[in-house]
Amino acid sequence: MAKATTIKEALAKWEERTGQKAGEAKEVKLYAQIPPLEKMDASLSTLVNCEKLSLSTNCIEKIANLNGLKYLKILSLGRNNIKNLNGLEAVGETLEELWISYNLIEKLKGIHVMKKLKVLYMSNNLVKDWAEFSKLGELPLLGDIVFVGNPLEEKHTAEGNWMEEAVKRLPKLKKLDGNPVIKQEEEEGDES
């Protein structure tokens, strides 16, 4: 089997293809590397100006080495093999959007550090209980969540109460699974 691509190799290919220097770029796309990336290694720390980083569609198992990315606002890690959210604390003060659908995440431990997070796309993971989902309530700015395809969502959608139960736990939500959240008071207020 082919050896995994390193971040350093992927960055060199990206620089060659785009004609940009990785250390100066605001947006860096390292998705779908062949062979795939398996580790977020220390070479990521060279991306000192990066605001949007895409590492989706690889074989990454752990979030790591984000400490040099002082301006990171959007992190795309969808379609990997990530099992938990450890490693995000390094970008807790700047990250506004986390795209982490199609991974193996069961627990949301560590999400509380993401104080600026507004958008969380984490469909098709393994979250199965409300205790985990409720941890999202610790994020003051979170307004848009995609959670479809998690066992918790599937169970409650089948029971017909997903939106209602989710919004009860996260009253600040504006959008859930792509649908605008309409609060009870707003509906009643429209009738007057």
Curated annotation (Swiss-Prot):
Q: Which Pfam families match?
A: LRR_4
Q: Does the UniProt entry include the keyword Cytoplasm?
A: yes
Q: Which residues cross the membrane?
A: none
What is the annotated localization of this protein? Cytoplasm, Cytoskeleton, Cilium axoneme
Keyword Repeat among UniProt keywords: yes
Q: Quote additional remarks.
A: Outer (ODAs) and inner (IDAs) dynein arms contain the molecular motors that generate the force to move cilia by ATP-dependent reactions. There are two mechanosensory systems that monitor and respond to the mechanical state (curvature) of the axoneme. One system involves the central pair microtubule complex and radial spokes and the second system involves the outer dynein arms.
Q: Cite the source lineage.
A: Eukaryota, Metazoa, Chordata, Craniata, Vertebrata
* InterPro entries reported for this sequence: Leu-rich_rpt, Leu-rich_rpt_4, LRR_dom_sf
Task: Set out the biological process GO terms recorded for this chain's protein.
Answer: outer dynein arm assembly
Ranges for domain LRRCT come to 150-192
LRR repeat windows: 49-70, 71-92, 94-115, 116-137
Any idea what job this protein has? Answer: Part of the multisubunit axonemal ATPase complexes that generate the force for cilia motility and govern beat frequency. Component of the outer arm dynein (ODA). May be involved in a mechanosensory feedback mechanism controlling ODA activity based on external conformational cues by tethering the outer arm dynein heavy chain (DNAH5) to the microtubule within the axoneme.
Which GO molecular function annotation, any one, does this entry have? Answer: dynein heavy chain binding
Q: What is the scientific name of the source organism?
A: Xenopus laevis
- Which cellular component terms (GO) are annotated to the entry? cell projection; cytoplasm; dynein complex; microtubule
Keywords tagged on the record: Cell projection, Cytoplasm, Cytoskeleton, Dynein, Leucine-rich repeat, Microtubule, Motor protein, Repeat
Q: Which gene encodes it?
A: dnal1
| Record's protein name | Dynein axonemal light chain 1
Q: What family does the Swiss-Prot or TrEMBL record give for this protein? A: Belongs to the dynein light chain LC1-type family.
Q: How does this protein assemble?
A: Interacts with DNAH5, a outer arm dynein heavy chain. Interacts with tubulin located within the A-tubule of the outer doublets in a ATP-independent manner.
Superkingdom in the source lineage: Eukaryota
